[in-house]
Regions:
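Conserved nucleotide-binding/hydrolysis micro-motifs of P-loop NTPases
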Residues: 16-17, 53
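Short, compact, well-ordered microdomains
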Residues: 61-65
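Short aromatic-glycine-(Arg/Gly/Cys) micro-motifs in beta-strand/loop hairpins
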Residues: 18-40
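Extended catalytic/binding region for NAD+/ADP-ribose chemistry, centered on the ART fold
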Residues: 35-60
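A general structural signal for short secondary-structure junctions and capping/turn motifs
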Residues: 1-3, 37-40, 57, 149-151
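Active-site and NAD+-binding cores of ADP-ribose-processing enzymes
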Residues: 2-4, 8, 13, 20, ...
Length: 176
């Protein structure tokens, strides 16, 4: 795969001290700790809004811009990958049923089931020699844009970076 085939700008909302340290180079990208919560909707990783600096700013007190190479991306806008996700869910469901355990559920802003299925799919793929470096997915959020609309006012695309080598550089976005 061409290393520079899918380059995008991503925006990460975070604490101001963290943003400053990263942008000034006082904190290396390799020291950036990925989120590993059991409810992270795209699984474990460092989360970015694709082309969404204002949304990142709404979420965190400061914003770090990043040039991202999606690399080998589990792109959930592609039916090839959503089909894999559906298959992985069925496999997990079978295991949980056989063990008499309830599957985790998504509740409100907690995406425990999504997190489990994506992390397991990435693990299964890795065992087969396919290493997903990033996960990308649209997130429909907010009220309808107008009455009867399927478009939501706060919809966005998020990226979870699992391989820090995909973060080519960081910058201070001009939010002016």
């Amino acid at each position: 795969m061409d290393r520079f085939s899918r380059i995008i700008l991503g925006y990460h909302g975070c604490e101001p001290d963290f943003a400053e340290a990263l942008i000034r180079g006082e904190l290396a990208i390799d020291d950036w700790k990925p989120s590993a919560n059991p409810y992270d909707w795209l699984g474990h990783g460092i989360y970015f809004w694709e082309h969404g600096p204002q949304r990142a700013g709404d979420w965190g007190g400061a914003v770090v811009g990043a040039v991202l190479n999606l690399g080998m991306c589990l792109d959930l806008t592609d039916i090839q990958f959503t089909s894999l996700l559906a298959d992985e869910y069925e496999s997990i469901r079978g295991v949980y049923e056989a063990e008499g355990r309830p599957l985790p559920k998504n509740k409100g802003k907690r995406h425990d089931l999504d997190c489990l299925v994506i992390n397991e799919l990435i693990g299964t793929a890795s065992e087969a020699g396919i290493v997903f470096q990033t996960v990308r997915c649209p997130f429909l959020e907010g009220d309808p844009a107008f009455p009867g609309s399927g478009i939501r006012r706060e919809s966005h695309i998020q990226i979870a970076v699992r391989d820090k080598a995909c973060i080519l550089g960081v910058f201070r976005p001009n939010l002016g």
